[in-house]
Amino acid sequence: MAIAIIAEYNPFHNGHIYQLEYTKKNFPNDKIYIILSGNFTQRGEISLADFKTKSKIALKYGADFIIKLPFEYATQAAHIFAKGAIKIVNQHKIDKIIFGSESNDVENLYKLANLWNQNQEAYNAFLKYALKLGYSFPKASAFALEEISGQKIVFPNDILGFEYIKQIVANNYPIRAYTLKRSEEFSLKNPEPNIASATYLRQLVNENKSISRFSPMKFIHPVCSLPNLYPEFQKIVRETSAENLAKIWLISEGIENLFKKHINEPNFEKFLNAVNSRRYTNSRIKRAMVYILFRIEDPSQFDEEKIQLDCWKNQGF
């Protein structure tokens, strides 16, 4: 018997420690597997710590086994991220997963996943309609689900958890999902006394502020971040033709021309704001930037271990 947690640990923090302790307490007979993304994340971020460091800290705080989520899944949209993660869970004959959920209503997520599975033709028609209107893929997916179910999934952990359960249902995997209540106030503006979101902690780290109240991890500047690589990204986009940029994975729908149009923006934030639109979310743009930076044409053949950034060398716990 085993249970999986699908994680990025960017960075590992007290909320993750609580999740591991909760899982050990409530599933005492199960080995805990962490399906862990590597040096890059689903939102197109460069991980503050590398895979080896994240693995060590997870094992220290209660995980039994670490399985790497391949780059080709770890740096994709939520539905592809979930597809890869749940496929690995099934391949290792792990019969349970547990994830944080704002609603903590796993039965409703199963209900919606079954409804989606039984009405895929209608769902896909609504999805295509919304995409033609210029919606981003996440917003188009939310629109299609609401059209067939009358429900919106609002919170980010519920959205990702729903994608996990969709994969379980669609593939008839012998896996049962469980949820751990996650507060909606677990955010930038309202960190709890010793627990805060990874987004908030990344902000603190990037501002060279201590996160010791919230995490056992320690970071030394300069830290790994996409903004720090923006000058290199500018150089590549300026020197590469639009035709050759379009050969890179995730560079489609003319986004290469949009990048070239705004490549003279003076910094990462201004570039992101210039390119962001109803169709292109920040995460979609950042994932594309990562693929351009490392010239990745086929993510299934990309060995991220060959990328050794100096900013990973002194990060630890």
UniProtKB/Swiss-Prot annotation:
- List all disulphide bridges recorded for this chain: none
User: Which reaction does this enzyme catalyse, per its entry?
Assistant: cytidine(34) in elongator tRNA(Met) + acetate + ATP = N(4)-acetylcytidine(34) in elongator tRNA(Met) + AMP + diphosphate
Record-listed ATP binding positions? 6-19, 100, 157, 182
Query: What single Pfam family name could you report for this chain, choosing any that match?
Result: HIGH_NTase1
Enzyme nomenclature, EC number: 6.3.4.-
Top EC category: ligase
Compartment list: Cytoplasm
User: Gene Ontology cellular component?
Assistant: cytoplasm
User: Which terms are listed as keywords in the entry?
Assistant: ATP-binding, Cytoplasm, Ligase, Nucleotide-binding, RNA-binding, tRNA processing, tRNA-binding
What are this entry's molecular-function GO terms?
ATP binding; ligase activity, forming carbon-nitrogen bonds; tRNA binding
> Which BP terms in the Gene Ontology apply to this protein?
tRNA modification
Which residues fall in a coiled-coil region? Answer: none
What is the protein's major site of localization?
cytoplasm
Q: Which family does it belong to?
A: Belongs to the TmcAL family.
Q: What does this protein do?
A: Catalyzes the formation of N(4)-acetylcytidine (ac(4)C) at the wobble position of elongator tRNA(Met), using acetate and ATP as substrates. First activates an acetate ion to form acetyladenylate (Ac-AMP) and then transfers the acetyl group to tRNA to form ac(4)C34.
Q: Which NCBIfam families match?
A: PRK13671.1 (NF010192)
Question: What's this protein's name?
Answer: tRNA(Met) cytidine acetate ligase
Origin organism is Mesomycoplasma hyopneumoniae (strain 7448)
